[in-house]
Amino acid sequence: TATVDGGTGILVALGATPQDKAGHPLRPGGGSLTELAGFDTAQLNIPAAAVEWVLLTDVTNPATGPDGAAAVFGPQKGATSKDITLLDAALAQLCDICEVDPTTPGFGAAGGLPIGITWLSTLMHGNHSHIHVLPGARMVAESVGLPELIHSADLVVTGEGRFDKQST
């Protein structure tokens, strides 16, 4: 991902507009979420929003805190320490408004994407049972029969986008 916005970019694309206390639309981007008071859903694309969501993640980071989306992945996207503090507070505000536990494993993935999608699923279905946050590597490996391919290979080469404390 290229942003830390808690999934609000997708929500906007689906017609949910983040708003401040005065009912004004927020500026795009994660930093403005510190001002979030709610969402205007008058233009929400209900058929597109009411789907079963399967989010494949490659991390188990929580949304906020020292291991959260802003702290761990913000620097990869060029965030300064000031940006990280702001983005962490913004994601905390989003979690509060969306009634999402910021310590949920995996909710820091993709810039906090599961936060917004959980809110959307709860809005559409009355609960969050229509969102599934799953380990992406395992799901992809199983879908392509990777264990069998590795077993029959002469050489296996893997890669990492950036070697950091998340790398194993």
In which residue ranges do the predicted regions lie?
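N-terminal loops that bind phosphate or other acidic moieties
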Residues: 2-168
